[in-house]
Amino acid sequence: MVIPAGTWRSGRITLKSNINLRLDKGAVLEFTGDVDDYQPAVFTRHEGVEVMGAGAFIYANKAKNIALTGEGVVMGPPMDVAMRKFPNGNSVVEKDVDYRMPVKQRLCDGKEGRTFYRPKSFAPINCKNVLV
């Protein structure tokens, strides 16, 4: 998948197996600050704790042979967007997550007053053969 030169706005991008996300020179991939653009919640880790949350701007889970290449730029949301003002939970994730709950029930998606952990830039989780 090629992102050509120019500025492109996006919510979460999920890479599947055998995909190379290439940003051409002059491409700027800017991610939105809208919490809804990172739904539904996906399996991720926050400070090593498994939860269902926003994941990452560029996300993959159990994918093989994936790549993020090129000379373009990946940008997080601007500072003035809602996501950056959203309550981010306690300073210690263990205070937000009940370890007795199955991971699928550990929702940190920002919905209905739940905690929201901001997405990481790139998170290949449980993936094999990753090239950056």
Protein language model features and the residues they cover:
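Extracellular/periplasmic carbohydrate-active domains that bind, remodel
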Residues: 1-132
